[in-house]
Amino acid sequence: SIRGQAMNKLYSLSIFIFLVSCQSQSNIYQKAVAVLQPGNESNVKGTVFFEQDKSNVIVTVTVSGLNSNSYHGFHIHEFGDIRSKDGKSAGGHYNPDGHPHALPPEKKRHAGSFGNLISDINGNVDTTFTDDTFSISGEFNPVIGRAVVIHAKRDDGGQPTGNAGSRIGFGVIGIAN
């Protein structure tokens, strides 16, 4: 009957809406981590922790193996593929909004374009900052499954990607508890 078909369609639509709402709620992660591995014969290692705080993400970076008192471009890249030793399998900068390359505090920049890490006399970095150009997961420029990359040189803000050189450390951004 027509009434039965209408009820079946309504029932199917209700189930679909329920499943979609459950899926979107379960994929909102609050914490993530990337464990860095060396690239291009560097000695870089460390961790990058991400914690969602309303519209900002708190980023905590602990890195060793950099040159003493040096600047290193630091970005989120498109893919979580870090199979290649040169890090190029991670793709280019993550740029879902199509902005030109820029450094913080510029608002219109690549998502997760963090500027530079600055190492101490021992080649270490231990820093925390916030960023509002992405989210860990959800609809606003999600970064779960992408890669974080440390470059060999300073990001000078130039086009198209800051002239930061080779990729000397990288890790996949994964879900943390």
Language-model features: where?
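Short, Lys/Arg-enriched N-terminal segments with co-localized hydrophobic residues
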Residues: S1-A6
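N-terminal hydrophobic targeting signals that begin at the initiator methionine
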Residues: M7-N8, Q23
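Basic side chains
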Residues: N8-K9, R146
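Alpha-helix initiation and N-capping motif
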Residues: K9-L10, N122
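Sec-dependent N-terminal signal peptides
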Residues: L10-L19
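N-terminal leader/targeting pre-sequences
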Residues: C22-N177
